[in-house]
Amino acid sequence: MDFSIKPLDAKSTIASIKTGCIAVAVFEDKKLSAAAQALDQKGGISAALKSGDISGKAGSTLLLRGVSGVAAERVLLVGLGKEDPVSEKDFSSAVQAVARAFTSLGATEAVIALPLDAVAARDAAWSIRCTILNTRDASYRFDSLKSKKEPAPAGVKKIVFAVSAASTAIAKDAIAQAVAQANGIDLTKDLGNLPANVCTPTYLANTAKKMAKEFKLQVEVLDRKQLQALKMGSFLSVTNGSVEPPKFIVLKHMGGKAKDAPVVLVGKGITFDSGGISLKPGAAMDEMKYDMGGAASVLGTMRAIAELKLKLNVIVVIPTCENMPSGSATKPGDIVTSMSGQTIEVLNTDAEGRLVLCDALTYVERFKPAAVIDVATLTGACITALGHHNSGLFTRSDDAHDALANELLAAGKASGDTAWRMPIEDSYQEQLKSNFADMANIGGPAGGAVTAACFLERYTKKYTWAHLDIAGTAWKSGAAKGSTGRPVPLLTSFLIQRAQTAR
């Protein structure tokens, strides 16, 4: 999919654009947008609206052919709901409808002339990014492992945004950001959708190496012997049951000043989670290939910011392995020593994500980070608490952590990839007490998402930290089964804003 802009001025008008299709907006009160009015020279569009052929409700569409006085072959009327102001939800519904309509058109090029600056509290750049991300999402396919691939859908391959001449620079920047973000989302989806016999820890490491070569990043992959030398006993305890060798990936984009402290993203990379000796139920266990969603999302985020050449220092760290049962697997009741020196009683081997993350969170101290954000499909309890709409955001409660939380929440809202802040309090730490070690790896059934975050918090005392639990948002089940690409939009928006602030 190719995206570009068409600046409009006195000489180049909406009606004079020669293209396969032009999309314009109508509203619920049977009112035409400015672009629709410009195309309604002979009254055909207003007649369709008055006759009730299109309601104007957000997401409604009507395709017209051969509109008199219009150079475009087709005009796609798109409902935007209430006019003043247009809500984010209604605009998103409208562009999703446009994306669906474009996939079935007989045209290869189309122009979008929606009122990009009409969304409440949002600018044209936001509307362009929203449109591109929805269009790319609608066109995403994962069929690389099918012997007989479905033919690629016909339809629009090039989308042009009609913008005012004054908005040209802003529109170009918005397109570049959205395309890079969409490329990162697609990578995250592809990695998540691959089966665990393909997307192994070694595969993730090779993906990082390829990305480093393509975008001139720095990469290091540590193996088992190196992890043993670092005394990562907690991480390694999870790897004991699998024949797949563990990997510890460090990928660096040093786009900022040499003296600037980096933002570190830590992604949980369990490429298949059987639960280990604490074996999961068989139903839907295939979906545990998605337990590397954190790793996939931080790789996708790194791809996006590398493509943008973001002027910010960002380091991605991924501890990756399988969690499998075998004669050599870690057993419930085993006690392991983490890289930090703290000991952990493993009461449940299916609470393994925190065991790999805690050593990674200790490792990243060496970078003296400006902030650390770990991303993990960590707990089913987070799904119980928040469903599949919001990721769970956990931080400590002080000025620095409140500021980081607010940045992430704002990035989530701006990108449509929302999170909800959850508590971390000392009272929950009591649930992690062990009679035999410094802590247990589970805290009982109550508040499971919170106690998991509290466990991680014990390893983050030397820097500002946030934890994103994406167990409910990283993938979908059922007929629409597949990786969502979240939270790449949130993370890239956060990092772009950080880079702009650092200028």
Curated annotation (Swiss-Prot):
| Bound cofactor: record note | Binds 2 manganese ions per subunit.
The residues that hold Mn(2+) 2 are 268, 273, 291, 352
Per the UniProt entry, the Enzyme Commission number(s) are 3.4.11.1, 3.4.11.10
* Known role: Presumably involved in the processing and regular turnover of intracellular proteins. Catalyzes the removal of unsubstituted N-terminal amino acids from various peptides.
Keyword Nucleotidyltransferase attached: no
Query: So where's the catalytic machinery, residue-wise?
Result: 280, 354
Q: Which Gene3D superfamilies match?
A: Leucine Aminopeptidase, subunit E, domain 1 (3.40.220.10), Zn peptidases (3.40.630.10)
Name the chemical reaction catalysed here. Release of an N-terminal amino acid, Xaa-|-Yaa-, in which Xaa is preferably Leu, but may be other amino acids including Pro although not Arg or Lys, and Yaa may be Pro. Amino acid amides and methyl esters are also readily hydrolyzed, but rates on arylamides are exceedingly low; Release of an N-terminal amino acid, preferentially leucine, but not glutamic or aspartic acids
The record's annotation in PANTHER family points to: CYTOSOL AMINOPEPTIDASE (PTHR11963:SF23), LEUCINE AMINOPEPTIDASE-RELATED (PTHR11963)
Q: Which PROSITE patterns match?
A: CYTOSOL_AP
SUPFAM superfamilies on file = Macro domain-like, Zn-dependent exopeptidases
- Cellular compartment(s): Cytoplasm
GO CC, one annotated term: cytoplasm
Name the family the entry cites. Belongs to the peptidase M17 family.
Q: Which InterPro entries match?
A: Leucine_aapep/pepB, Macro_dom-like, Peptidase_M17_C, Peptidase_M17_leu_NH2_pept, Peptidase_M17_N
Q: Which residues bind Mn(2+) 1?
A: 273, 350, 352
Superkingdom as given in the UniProt entry: Bacteria
Q: Which UniProt keywords apply?
A: Aminopeptidase, Cytoplasm, Hydrolase, Manganese, Metal-binding, Protease
What protein name applies here? Probable cytosol aminopeptidase
A Pfam family it matches: Peptidase_M17
